[in-house]
Curated annotation (Swiss-Prot):
Classification of source organism: Bacteria, Pseudomonadati, Campylobacterota, Epsilonproteobacteria, Campylobacterales
GO CC entries: plasma membrane
Protein name per the record: Uncharacterized protein Cj0987c
GO MF terms, alphabetically ordered: transmembrane transporter activity
Keyword NADP: no
Organism: Campylobacter jejuni subsp. jejuni serotype O:2 (strain ATCC 700819 / NCTC 11168)
Amino acid sequence: MEKSLLFHFRRIGVEFIIFSVYAVFSISWAATGSLMPLISNDLALNTQQATLITSMIVVAKIFGASFTAFLVYKFGLKKGYFLGCILMSSGIFLSFVDSYSGILIIRFLTGLGSACALVCLVPIAQQWFEKKALHFVISFNITSNLVGITLGLVLAESISNYFGNWRDSLSFYAWINLILLILWLFVGKDENKKEEKKNNAKDLIYALKSRVTWGMIIFYIGPILFLNSLFTFLPTFYAQYAGFSKELADFAKKEIPALANFAIIFGPYLGLFFKRKNISFKIMLLSGGACIFICGFCMLFLQNLVLIQIFAVLSGIFYSM
């Protein structure tokens, strides 16, 4: 791997872009949940319709891995990443779309793009970094989701107030991603190995036929829906249905999702500990899913804020275990 000064500047630029793209998406995703009362009032939506706006991203993520594999195989990593992630910038049209169905389509496209951004974090890092640096960069990139969601929960209302409406504030994040992806065209690179495409085709077909692939996809639908509910349904639940005072509800709807997402950092360490104790991955998946269900139940029906905070932290740990 070349070590010129230009190379180092270029890979710093690449790292900044791929981290920021997914972080900005995560800000937008979390902000949508925080702004859902405004969106619901503006569009006259019921609870089910409002939930579907954010759930469309989850639905798209289910198909996103296969979609990304096809793009990378067909166009290479540089163009595939660009074409996939550019779908996230479809949010720039939120300012002009008035129909509920149009918004759902934009959210679905955004979800497909976000899946591409997430899946490509590792292969892009492998292009530019080696050994210890690579492990650090991959771990660092994973936190982009946490950073984005936390910023979204904290800043969503302030940014919306600055723009004066929820449409322009959500479009703002899409414009940022569009600028980042244009920069990507100048710093990204493709592999020049002719045999790689053949190998990728075999790997893609094998992965699509694998029972493990589809089993993992089906299993993670539940945890992803839970993660989605943390910053979509829960803030609305605490504000309107939990019976909390206004001050307590305003505190809970921001802190509880933030705590759960912060705790996600520590889940892999618990998983590694159990793995060293020779506990199988299958058992960890099943027990982790059951614990997430218990934590979610307690977060909904407990009235003690301290206990809700504890179960929020535990839910984040079990989610990423």
